[in-house]
Amino acid sequence: MARIAGVDLPRDKRVEVALTYVYGIGRSRAAETLANTGVNPDTRVYQLTEEELVKLREWIDANYKVEGDLRREVAADIRRKIEIGCYQGIRHRRGLPVRGQRTQTNARTRKGKKKTVAGKKKAGRK
């Protein structure tokens, strides 16, 4: 089983797709990595030679921040924004959307399950 950056890549997938299992590598970075290392994107993971795997590992380690390092950096960036009290930090602290999305309706992913708030009672008919 091929391991890159501490992640087991699925054996039967194409290398281009399998690399996207690593946090911090998407389709475009995977394609760039394969182009720079000279590995054919259509190759299946189980067909990779040890030499190609070493090339991929070295290229990724040298050029990209992935997995734990990237997660730590993102978490540190969010913590910093919360500490300095900027608008984005306040939105993170309150658990609301950070990038300007509307919140009167929608935003359920960030806000969580609906909490019903008591509203005005309608006046009865006389």
UniProtKB/Swiss-Prot annotation:
Region (Disordered): 95-126
Biased composition (Basic residues): 108-126
Highest taxon of the lineage: Bacteria
NCBIfam families, per database record: uS13_bact
Annotated Gene Ontology cellular component terms: cytosol; small ribosomal subunit
Keyword Cell membrane attached: no
Name of the gene this protein is made from: rpsM
Protein name: Small ribosomal subunit protein uS13
InterPro entries attached to this UniProt entry: Rbsml_uS13_C (IPR027437), Ribosomal_uS13 (IPR001892), Ribosomal_uS13-like_H2TH (IPR010979), Ribosomal_uS13_bac-type (IPR019980), Ribosomal_uS13_CS (IPR018269)
Similarity-based family: Belongs to the universal ribosomal protein uS13 family.
GO terms of biological process kind: translation
